[in-house]
Amino acid sequence: VLEKYAELHEQPARLICIDYLELIRAYTDSQMAKVQGLARELKVFSREHDVAVVVLHQVKRGEANAGHKPLDLTDGKFGSEESADFVLGMYRPSMNPTINQDLRDSLDNDIRLQFLKTRTGGGIHPEGKQHYWNGDTGRISEIRF
């Protein structure tokens, strides 16, 4: 599909976002092998066509973390972390079920973005860097102090 798109359009794509990698067909026995193979192929495609590829993956969390705690690379492994140049995470402290409603309301627009993996290895801002989230537009912006 990506190769056909690249051939059909004069203006090359600069960014490709894939929301659900597991929906792409691959012929392997295991889901993990399928995802790892697709991740490698996407990385090669990205280099050959000089295009950024972003793969989104929603982490399934247990009841202990309803989306309010920082992530680490062991959360929701899906097979392509090893191939990724960067792994980003995000969470919303207001999702914490143990805080009172007033605190939850005060944190409603708080979203934390994490760099869990970079090209040089470890993460940056493991607790997440605070950003402003607009629930009406879905836009995330940096908080300036």
PLM region spans:
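C-terminal regions of RecA-like/P-loop NTPase motor modules
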Residues: 1-16, 44-49, 61-145
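Walker B catalytic acidic pair
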Residues: 20
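Flexible beta-alpha connector loops of hexameric P-loop NTPases
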Residues: 25-36, 63-72
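A short alpha/beta connector and helix-capping loop motif
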Residues: 29-45, 88
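Residue-level detector of anion-binding/catalytic polar loops
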Residues: 52
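Conserved H-loop
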Residues: 55-58
